[in-house]
């Protein structure tokens, strides 16, 4: 059976860890008390009941904790434990509650407590009181935050239903197509008044506090003339694009849709230009009010509906976390008080638990009421009354891990090892990896296999990262915003790696066998590459389709970096590509080799010596750094944080270092060598500073952990120092360009492959500390759920 302390650590909300009861610290106080009691012959036992469920495996879903045991235990307690808010003067302790700005509990040890342990008992209850007060304060603050969010969402829902109703009425009056509205939102009937057939949008440019938002504002006719004057002057806010939508009852309603994609940005700009060129026909909603009425854009309403739906899901998740927080803390108080009774022999559970039961975090039912209300609203308006469908969004189930996956991992690993050993023996006998002038194999086939090897080595390192993050309770699924229940588990990643490498090495073995016998088999590596590309783009629901499509979306966002809003997973993946420059160059060469038809004649010189092809290869070396720099520029544009410009400078320095390397390869003069050393050394220092200080959060001079940071997830500090040293050594891999190491008769391409593999390993090592720092930042702000921006904002007409 699993001890409660391990269950407690494994099932708490990772980002709220410091707000939970410090159960381990209270246990240490009890051990000190045990030392005080033991000389007097008191029988000590600290065993815990084993009536708990086993520890859940997923870090990303702590709210899935099974609370049936907790409720059963609390129901078994005597009724006298509940309901009193007054101090209890019976037994070994007295618990008093002071009410001021908040509840504060203080416990006094009575003379009945033995004098030999009175000091330790007072220290224990002082710490226990502090924990209870901390839990109360945090619970109340989070509850108020969620209640405020719930109130805002109620207003958002009312506005959405009203606009959907007006849109439906307008469409039925003009196009006789009210049935085209979204059936998932129930609409109430509303009267629009007399309307004109030329009803259309009125566009304006406005400034808002939210970056990159598309805004819809309802204004009176007098405001429209001033607004058009601003548009004619060409003033367009850097932060937002404005769209005006009028209504009879809502005169100043802003619909803020984030411009996260190029389509939304282009659509907003097109609407602005169209409204500048076309006259604005006015229609009366009410002859006395004189308000301009316009139709409601259904596309904007769909985006708004999606945003509100996401906000409800995040609110429900947060309320679930808050319920978990309450029940786990209640269980912790019960367990630690039982342990105290066993150590001291004094009956204190009934007295102290009475105070805990009446405290705010346990007695308040507002969160549960709001949770039920959110569930009801979601079922009615976003699931068409289908509760099961709604629960798939609100409480997504985690995929069960199968032992079948583990079996196939072992099977594929065995196949890979056997085939790889056979391939190495055959390649050694054939002398394929020695320095030979007539080695067509190294020029034509080896780039394909080295490219796949680097790719799946990187994927394997990511699987190792997932194992380490899970063990360290780093909530990587929340950081990357992966869809709950659909993200890959580490076993899935290892299965993909082992199966793919077994296939690749098998093809390598077959190709080498044919090549040694003199058969023309140059098309085999090309078919292997084509097969993987077809599998990547396969539209059928097979071989992790959701993950493959998400990967393609991320690549699209990276390639068009300035046009898409940058999120964590996008720039994290772009950082991975910065470590895969050799793989990208191999991909470019292989594409040229097979597209140009050189594989038929084995004339590989075209893709090496042709000037424009060679220049393209150099451009590929710059691409990952360019994409990452553009992401920094977009983040600075969105957030106005100059730190992103400093980060952009790091990638510019990397591009300069790559350019110096290209210049040295073309002209191996002393001047080119000096330029390479100076630029590469400066870029390396820049990158090391950013790695240690910004990405890892280390090298803090005033930290309680010398030159590290205050909060560390790993227990051993020496690991952090060793990791910094390892990162420093691996960052200096560019020196091989200057030193030209020679390992006997081994081909230089094999040496380059090993150096590229070391960079991939460095990146995998870097990934762990990067996400550790991100997780600690979230934990420092107690950020366990996403804050989804809300689409509708009502403003005063004067604004």
Swiss-Prot record:
The chain crosses the membrane at residues 407-427, 448-468, 493-513, 523-543, 673-693, 719-739. One of its GO terms (cellular component) is trans-Golgi network. Residues 608-799 form the EXS domain. Residues 2-354 form the SPX domain. Residues 234-243 have a biased composition (Polar residues). Residues 180-193 have a biased composition (Low complexity). Expressed in roots and flowers. Keywords: Cell membrane, Membrane, Phosphate transport, Transmembrane, Transmembrane helix, Transport. This is Phosphate transporter PHO1-1.
């Amino acid at each position: 059976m699993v001890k409660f302390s391990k269950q407690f650590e494994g099932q708490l909300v990772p980002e709220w860890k410091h707000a939970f009861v410090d159960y381990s610290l209270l246990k240490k106080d009890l051990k000190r008390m045990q030392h005080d009691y033991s000389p007097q012959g008191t029988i000590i036992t600290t065993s815990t009941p084993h009536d708990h469920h086993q520890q859940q495996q997923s870090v990303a879903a702590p709210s899935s904790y099974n609370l049936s045991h907790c409720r059963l235990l609390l129901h078994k307690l005597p009724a006298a434990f509940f309901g009193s808010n007054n101090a209890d003067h019976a037994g070994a302790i007295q618990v008093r509650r002071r009410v001021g700005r908040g509840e504060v509990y203080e416990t006094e040890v009575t003379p009945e407590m033995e004098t030999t342990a009175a000091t330790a008992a007072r220290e224990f209850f002082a710490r226990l009181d502090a924990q209870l007060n901390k839990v109360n304060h945090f619970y109340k603050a989070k509850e108020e935050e969620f209640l405020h969010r719930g109130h805002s969402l109620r207003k958002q829902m009312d506005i959405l239903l009203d606009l959907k109703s007006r849109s439906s009425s307008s469409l039925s009056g003009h196009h006789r197509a009210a049935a085209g509205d979204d059936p998932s939102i129930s609409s109430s009937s509303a009267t629009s008044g007399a309307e004109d057939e030329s009803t259309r949008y009125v566009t304006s440019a406005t400034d808002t506090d939210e970056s990159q938002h598309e805004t819809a504002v309802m204004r009176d006719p007098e405001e429209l003339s001033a607004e058009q004057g601003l548009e004619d002057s060409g003033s367009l806010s850097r932060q937002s694009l404005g769209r005006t939508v009028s209504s009879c009852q809502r005169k100043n309603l802003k619909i803020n849709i984030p411009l996260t994609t190029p389509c939304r940005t282009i659509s907003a700009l097109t609407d602005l230009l169209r409204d500048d060129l076309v006259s604005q026909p006015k229609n009366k909603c009410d002859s006395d009010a004189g308000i301009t009425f316009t139709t409601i854009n259904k596309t904007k309403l769909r985006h708004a509906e999606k945003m509100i739906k996401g906000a409800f899901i995040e609110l429900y998740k947060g309320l679930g976390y808050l319920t978990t927080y309450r029940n786990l803390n209640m269980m912790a108080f019960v367990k630690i008080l039982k342990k105290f009774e066993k150590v001291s022999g004094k009956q204190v559970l009934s007295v102290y638990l009475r105070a805990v039961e009446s405290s705010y975090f346990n007695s308040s039912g507002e969160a549960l009421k709001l949770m039920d209300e959110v569930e009801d609203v979601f079922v009615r308006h976003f699931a068409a009354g289908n509760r099961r469908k709604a629960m798939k969004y609100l409480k997504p189930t985690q995929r069960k891990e199968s032992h079948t996956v583990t079996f196939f991992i072992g099977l594929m690993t065995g196949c890979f090892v056997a085939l790889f050993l056979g391939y190495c023996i055959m390649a050694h006998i054939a002398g394929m990896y020695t320095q030979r002038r007539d080695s067509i194999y190294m020029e034509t086939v080896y780039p394909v296999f080295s490219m796949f090897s680097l790719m799946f080595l990187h994927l394997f390192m990511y699987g190792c990262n997932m194992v380490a993050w899970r063990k360290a309770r780093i909530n990587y699924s929340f950081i990357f915003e992966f869809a709950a229940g659909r993200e890959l588990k580490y076993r899935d990643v290892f299965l993909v790696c082992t199966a793919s490498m077994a296939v690749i090495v098998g093809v390598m073995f077959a190709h080498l066998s044919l090549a040694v016998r003199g058969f023309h088999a140059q098309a085999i590596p090309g078919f292997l590459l084509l097969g993987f590309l077809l599998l990547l783009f396969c539209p059928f629901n097979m071989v992790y389709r959701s993950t493959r499509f998400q990967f393609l979306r991320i690549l699209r966002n990276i390639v068009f970096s300035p046009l898409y809003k940058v999120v964590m997973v996008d720039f994290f993946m772009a950082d991975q590509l910065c470590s895969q420059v050799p793989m990208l160059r191999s991909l470019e060469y292989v594409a040229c080799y097979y597209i140009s038809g050189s594989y038929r004649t084995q004339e590989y010189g075209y893709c090496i010596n042709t000037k424009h092809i060679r220049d393209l290869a150099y451009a590929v070396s710059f691409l990952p750094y360019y994409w990452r720099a553009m992401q920094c520029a977009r983040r600075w544009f969105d957030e106005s944080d100059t730190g992103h410009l400093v980060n952009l400078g790091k990638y510019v320095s990397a591009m300069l270092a790559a350019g110096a390397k290209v210049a040295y390869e073309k002209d191996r003069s002393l001047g080119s060598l000096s330029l390479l050393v100076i630029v590469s050394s400066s870029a390396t220092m820049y990158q090391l500073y950013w790695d240690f200080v910004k990405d890892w959060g280390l090298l803090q001079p005033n930290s309680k952990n010398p030159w590290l940071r205050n909060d560390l997830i790993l227990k051993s500090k020496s690991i952090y120092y060793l990791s910094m040293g390892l990162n420093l050594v691996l960052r200096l891999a560019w020196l091989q360009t200057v030193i030209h190491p020679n390992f006997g008769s081994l081909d230089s391409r094999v040496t380059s492959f090993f150096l590229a593999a070391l960079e991939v390993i460095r990146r995998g090592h870097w990934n762990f500390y990067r996400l550790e720092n991100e997780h600690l930042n979230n934990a420092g702000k107690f950020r366990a759920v996403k804050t989804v921006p809300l689409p509708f904002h009502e403003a005063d007409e004067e604004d």
